[in-house]
Amino acid sequence: MAISKTEKDNIIKEYATHEGDTGSVEVQVALLTADINNLTDHMKSHKHDHHSYVGLLKKIGHRRNLLRYLENNDINRYRELIKKLGLRR
């Protein structure tokens, strides 16, 4: 269910704003999006897994807060990230 280390490293390389960047908003949102997509696929086949569902909702809320922060502080980075990830906002 969790993303593998190689997947995580690839996402960090793709969305990092500078070398060694693992904590920028873009990287955090990209990692959360990968987790959310994995959990969404899991929930399609395990409809009664309520514990995972609660975790999914928490991750969605965390991503929403990070996106709201980015939207309020740097709208151009926000728009670029939304387009790159293919999110509907």
From Swiss-Prot:
**Annotated GO MF terms:** rRNA binding; structural constituent of ribosome
SMART domains the UniProt entry points to: Ribosomal_S15
Listed Gene3D superfamilies? 6.10.250.3130, S15/NS1, RNA-binding
UniProt keywords, alphabetically: Ribonucleoprotein, Ribosomal protein, RNA-binding, rRNA-binding
Q: Which Pfam families does this one have?
A: Ribosomal_S15 (PF00312)
List where this protein forms a coiled coil: none
Any one GO BP annotation for this protein: translation
Instruction: List GO terms (cellular component aspect).
Output: cytosolic small ribosomal subunit
Q: Record keywords: Protein biosynthesis included?
A: no
- Provide the assembly information: Part of the 30S ribosomal subunit. Forms a bridge to the 50S subunit in the 70S ribosome, contacting the 23S rRNA.
Role this protein plays: One of the primary rRNA binding proteins, it binds directly to 16S rRNA where it helps nucleate assembly of the platform of the 30S subunit by binding and bridging several RNA helices of the 16S rRNA. Forms an intersubunit bridge (bridge B4) with the 23S rRNA of the 50S subunit in the ribosome.
Entry's family note: Belongs to the universal ribosomal protein uS15 family.
Q: What is this protein called?
A: Small ribosomal subunit protein uS15
Which species does the entry assign this protein to?
Lactobacillus helveticus (strain DPC 4571)
Q: Which gene encodes it?
A: rpsO
